[in-house]
Amino acid sequence: MVMKREVVGYTTMSEHLIDTQLTRSPFFFASANQSMLGCGVAHAFQQAIPFAELANQAKQLLQQAKRDECDNPLLFGIVPFDPKTPTRFMIPRTLYVSSSPRLNRPAHLTRQVAKLISSPSGEQYKQGVSHLLNMFHHSGLSKVVLSRAIEIATEQEIALPTLLRSLLAINHHGYTFAASLDEQRKLIGASPELLVAKRGNYLISNPLAGSRPRSQDAQENAQRRASLLNTAKDLHEHGLVVEEVERIMSRYCRNLYTPMVPSVIETETMLHLSTLLEGQVSDPEVCALQVAADLHPTPAVCGFPRESAYQAIRELEEFDRGYFTGMVGWCDARGNGEWVVTIRCAEVGSHQMKLFAGAGIVDESLPQSELEETGAKMKTILAAAGIELNDVLTA
């Protein structure tokens, strides 16, 4: 079955296709430059496989599409945090592409009344942080990302097109996505973190680690930005991530450039330390997904060393992350692609939402501060949906 590609105006994408196609679309993915929406499924794969096999499996699916007389098909995928969870790849029957719409925030976002279905207490999360701090003194662990999840139910139906447009409006410089999990649920998010992109012969990665909640007061926000760049704990946490990403990127790049000091980027709710790594690929045949699979999961969402952090997460987190802190993105038959870290996301149904957030725990972490960080991160999706749960996010 041939994949058809159609370029449309950004108004058509944002005002027509998102409204009429999103609910049954297998995926939507937007970066700062372009938006893509798939309709129908020409080829699909869903199976738990080792991350080392991701690139080969994607190539097989893309080759099937090329045999259908499509010169450069595009594959969309969601990859889990744990390889025991199925990876999902699909190639659409029709791919709509536009420049990314510059949407304004909704003037009057309908407020949703929501109630908690399940939520671990803040004390429980802080106990997990304290347990990790004790572990650091007698193990080889340097960092563990500890996460939590909350489930809520809403009185009114959650309008997926409205939620997605709200995220697009606050995420001009990041990556906004929606992927079908089943007939009832979608994975929707607004990630600020680029795991890797390949454009021709160039590779780019933009790891984020070290965070503060963003303040609406300009003076306070400036102080928080300065604090991020001047606090040993945050610089140490960020350095662990950058060092590991640089080590892996150097396998694939020549002339790899890594800035010596980080900068600060802002999202709607957070400030993050950021480092942009750029290089030329040594082998033009390398595909974006191969590099992404080697990087995944970075210390920004798992910890360091990787396997020890995995084990600590399995012991301390009482829920299955699923696709949270996995990766979501696309690649084409020529090896180009963009893969982003699946954060600031939720599993969304018609009247239910499961939200996730995590914080990087290092030796200098404070349990209450880490709890507040996870609450601030959850506000990205909650605010876009018109839901306020401030009291339960940090208690």
UniProtKB/Swiss-Prot annotation:
GO terms for biological process: vibriobactin biosynthetic process. Pathway: Siderophore biosynthesis; vibriobactin biosynthesis. GO terms for molecular function: isochorismate synthase activity. It catalyses: chorismate = isochorismate. Pfam families: Chorismate_bind. Its EC number is 5.4.4.2. Keywords: Isomerase. It is an enzyme of class 5 (isomerase). The keyword Isomerase applies. Coiled coil: none annotated. Belongs to the isochorismate synthase family. PANTHER family: ISOCHORISMATE SYNTHASE ENTC (PTHR42839:SF2). This is Vibriobactin-specific isochorismate synthase.
